[in-house]
Amino acid sequence: MPSQMEHAMETMMLTFHRFAGDKDHLTKEDLRVLMEREFPGFLENQKDPLAVDKIMKDLDQCRDGKVGFQSFLSLVAGLTIACNDYFVVNMKQKGKK
């Protein structure tokens, strides 16, 4: 029986390939749709309407208009780290009360 972590890994792979389709990469439009559907809270909290464009620029290291799986994982990892930092701060504040 797969562990929770194995399910999480499978979810990341399936999500990437669902939005990439038959390709082995995400286009800017693929990334925009993925972000809107899978990270709606993140985009809603962005004050910059060009947030997806900036994320694409950061992730597209080859400057070919494509984001591969490794770069996608970097995005997920970065968002997870930011969420964890927020979580830890809130847990510490709750502990002080």
UniProtKB/Swiss-Prot annotation:
GO terms for cellular component: AnxA2-p11 complex; cell surface; collagen-containing extracellular matrix; membrane raft; nuclear matrix; plasma membrane; plasma membrane protein complex; RNA polymerase II transcription regulator complex. Keywords: Acetylation, Repeat. It comes from the Eukaryota. Signal peptide: none annotated. One of its GO terms (biological process) is regulation of neurogenesis. Because S100A10 induces the dimerization of ANXA2/p36, it may function as a regulator of protein phosphorylation in that the ANXA2 monomer is the preferred target (in vitro) of tyrosine-specific kinase. This is Protein S100-A10. It comes from Mus musculus (Mouse).
